[in-house]
């Protein structure tokens, strides 16, 4: 009982003392077990008392404690202050990279995500036009790029790889826009955009795969293909809904550099420098009645001042109107416009009218279509002297080979002023990727 009380009062200071206490206990038990044998062998010696045994054990424990202290002192003098044990490299990796991984995941969740979709086509075409040859041609390869910059801001771009008549392939940034969407009634886009003249120019961009026919109507041909409209513009475009109930009114207001005076320049779109200080302005209004889904009617007014070399400045006004009805299995497009050129200092005003109509109906994977187009520019028109009169029908068939591939076969007959009519046949393979 005395031993138990003593052991309860004496508490080791550290783990090493506990170890030596266990050793002392083992010695004590061994002594108790061996004492009968010793008494039997040495009957003449009196047996030791319990107090003497305890005193002997305490003496040994004290000796062991003293030795441990000496060893600890020698170790401290030889190695200096004790250093914390470093974690193994494998344990340090998660601690070191966890914040980086969290930041990267946060950027993936909240930062801009770039999305790219591609469109292109390959055509085989031939005609009876003098000087032309039957050829395979690479169409525009369009990389349509979008990104959600933030909740309100978005990025949109069309990067086009295109071969010219010299067989060289060039790269053009056809659209590049930073778009801000405040609500359904106001959105603002800044950069290079497709001018909201009529319907076709903002409904179909740089991809023949979206279009029913092989190509765009002549009125809406791109500038570098001989088009007469300012298809592209660099500036700002605001758009949105107009509170009008079931009438579904929308507006577009645009201000930009406009296009050059259709001279043989390397670039018709004024991407960096405007040829004059006057800015082109375009106002458009259209309706999408809720009672008849697919119907859209509207008009637009475009105003600019052209500055051709060695000629007086020319005021340009473009009035356009459209009525279209587009459903998944049926399409009917109708657009008409007139381009007014008024040279300063002259009393004569030049008007160039044009229109097209296109209708198609889908039957399963097949969609036959018909288009008729017309444009008539005066021979002495100051800007469109090379356009003249051209009109005629186009008949074609589009076959949906898959959800991403379409085959088109189209025949065109074009009548020209004081020149032979042109008959052409085109086979096109258009696809998206």
Identify the role of each PLM range:
Residues 130, 168, 176-181, 189-192, ...:
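Outer-membrane beta-barrel pore domains
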Residues 21-34:
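Bacterial N-terminal signal peptides
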Residues 269-278, 314:
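Interfacial loop-to-helix transition and helix-capping segments at the boundaries
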Residues 254, 258-272, 304-308:
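Active-site-proximal beta-alpha loop/turn segments in soluble metabolic enzymes
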Residues 37-125:
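N-terminal periplasmic/intermembrane-space "pro-region" immediately following the signal or transit peptide
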Residues 227, 274, 348:
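Glycine- and other small-residue-rich loops at beta-strand/loop junctions that grip anionic moieties
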Residues 102-261, 277-282, 286-293, 358-369, ...:
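Outer membrane beta-barrel
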Residues 1-20:
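N-terminal secretory signal peptides that target proteins for export/translocation
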